[in-house]
Structure formats: C-alpha cells, structure tokens
From Swiss-Prot:
Function: One of the proteins required for the normal export of preproteins out of the cell cytoplasm. It is a molecular chaperone that binds to a subset of precursor proteins, maintaining them in a translocation-competent state. It also specifically binds to its receptor SecA.
Keyword Chaperone part of the UniProt annotation: yes
Swiss-Prot/TrEMBL GO biological process terms: protein folding; protein tetramerization; protein transport
Gene Ontology CC: cytoplasm
Subcellular location: Cytoplasm
Pfam family, one: SecB
InterPro entries: SecB, SecB-like_sf
Protein's name according to its UniProt entry: Protein-export protein SecB
Family under the similarity heading: Belongs to the SecB family.
Top-level taxon: Bacteria
C-alpha cells in the first residue's frame, strides 16, 4: 500500500477575523447632491502564509471604489483573515486550498462588512456578486504556466 493512501486529509477553520477596515468618502457631502450612477470597481487579492506546521493564515483583500465621473464617491477596503489547519494536503492541492477554497470561505464575511460600511456611509445599498475563486485560481495557474513556457522559449532561442 502506498503512503499516500494512509495519509488522511484534514481541514479545519480555527478563526475568521477582520484584519483591517478602511472606508473613505473624500468628496462628501457634495457627492450626495449628484445623481447616483456610479462606476463601481472591485479589486480582489489573496495572500497566505504558514504560521506553524499545517497552520496557515489566509488574507482576502477586497477593495471597492465607486466613482461619479472623475470624483471618488467612496473607497472601501476590507482585509478578511482566516486561520486554517490543513494537514495531508500538499503541492498544487495545497495551493488551490489556500488560493481558492479559503477565499471562498472568507468572501461572505468581507462582503457583509463592505455592505455594512457602505450603508453606514449613507450610500445606496451595494450588493457584491459571488466570486468564483476556483476560476480565478485556474486563470492564475494558466498565466503562471504561460510565463514559464515563455521563459523556456527565450532560453532555448539564446
């Protein structure tokens, strides 16, 4: 029997927390007097680090910027963190877990926090659509593969 079949996979959420929150309405109160047809921009970023053997921190940064023309109506940023115990998962599976599975868990918390901040800023309700972190992670892997192939071709041509 192989060792891999004897290894059990284990995943546990230890803690979910808000690491950082920022809300700015730099053009208030003038922005409230304009017709509300904003251009909303959403930026996502994830970072992970190993805190101890098999214990990882994953931080999902969600930044939402709403602009009316050239003026920023509001800028909202939330860093939602989580501490996860992950055992028996390595390599690409671990990267997928940290880069997609954990952010999928964290996103609803970050979304709720952003919705609350925007509401407290007295702006119209903002509902962020669900994000497919699995698809984003697959795009990331594809970009990494293309970059490494491009680097190999450059070396072969030299």
């Amino acid at each position: 029997m192989s060792e891999q079949s004897n290894t059990e996979m284990a995943f546990q959420i230890q803690r979910i927390y808000t690491k950082d929150i920022s809300f700015e309405a730099p053009n208030a109160p003038q922005v409230f007097q304009q017709e509300w047809q904003p251009e909303v921009k959403l930026d996502l970023d994830t970072a992970s680090s190993e805190l101890a053997q098999g214990v990882y921190e994953v931080v999902l940064r969600v930044t939402v910027t709403a602009a009316l023309g050239e003026e920023t109506a509001f800028l909202c940023e939330v860093q939602q963190g989580g501490i996860f115990s992950i055992d028996g998962i390595e390599g690409t599976q671990l990267a997928h877990c940290l880069g997609a599975y954990c952010p999928n868990i964290l996103f609803p918390y970050a979304r709720e926090c952003i919705t609350s901040l925007v509401s407290r800023g007295t702006f119209p309700q903002l509902n962020l659509a669900p994000v497919n972190f699995d698809a984003l992670f697959m795009n990331y892997l594809q970009q990494q593969a293309e970059q490494s192939q491009g680097g190999e071709q450059t070396e072969q041509e030299a």
